[in-house]
């Protein structure tokens, strides 16, 4: 164990809590944080230097984003994609299906201006994208294609930039739900993790 960054220090310096995804920049690190110091959404992004010291918050604005979760970026296209889960105060007590209908869980994917560090476009996925979790861009740094697994909808969402330079999205995989006597609705496939092969040919 090299270093511990105490949650109390993060809260005091950035008003953030509930770390999730860690990604490296050229010589620095950003971590998605799902809540503020009191566990309310949307949280933000913790920025660390190469020695794991806190710089502050990475983003300049969260815009209208209601929730945070995973993120990934393609710097050559000046874009970052982020997904949504829920506020720590919502998911920490345990999952309640009714809270999805009360809009306490996410259903959007956000595209960011990576240089400006602020969101610029949102895909509202609706019922096709309930609780979109892991996001992946192609490993090819020139590609604009990305994917996200929507856990509760049990769907795979695909996005890309078209020939006109506009971002588009579509549902490409829909896993059937299965009936269960103890559930009020058919049990979804719950796609919790997705993975792209290193040659970008296969999605797992």
State the predicted function of each range.
Residues 24, 73, 137-139, 196:
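Residue-level recognition of a conserved intra-blade site in WD40 beta-propeller repeats
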């Amino acid at each position: 164990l090299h270093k511990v960054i105490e949650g109390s220090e993060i809260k005091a310096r950035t008003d953030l809590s509930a770390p999730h995804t860690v990604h490296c920049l050229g010589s620095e690190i950003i971590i998605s944080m799902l809540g503020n110091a009191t566990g309310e959404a949307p949280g933000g992004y913790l920025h660390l230097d190469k020695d794991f010291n806190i710089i502050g918050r990475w983003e300049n604005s969260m815009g209208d984003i209601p929730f945070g979760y995973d993120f990934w970026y393609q710097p050559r296209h000046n874009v970052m994609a982020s997904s949504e889960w829920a506020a720590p105060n919502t998911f920490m007590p345990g999952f309640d299906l009714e809270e999805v209908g009360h809009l306490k869980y996410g259903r959007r994917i956000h595209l960011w201006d990576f240089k400006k560090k602020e969101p610029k476009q949102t895909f509202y996925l609706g019922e096709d994208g309930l609780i979109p979790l892991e996001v992946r861009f192609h490993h090819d740094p020139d590609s604009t294609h990305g994917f996200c697994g929507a856990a509760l909808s049990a769907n795979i969402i695909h996005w890309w930039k078209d020939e006109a330079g506009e971002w588009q999205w579509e549902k490409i995989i829909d896993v059937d739900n299965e009936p269960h006597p103890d559930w009020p609705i058919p049990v979804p496939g719950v796609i919790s993790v997705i993975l792209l092969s290193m040659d970008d040919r296969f999605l797992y």
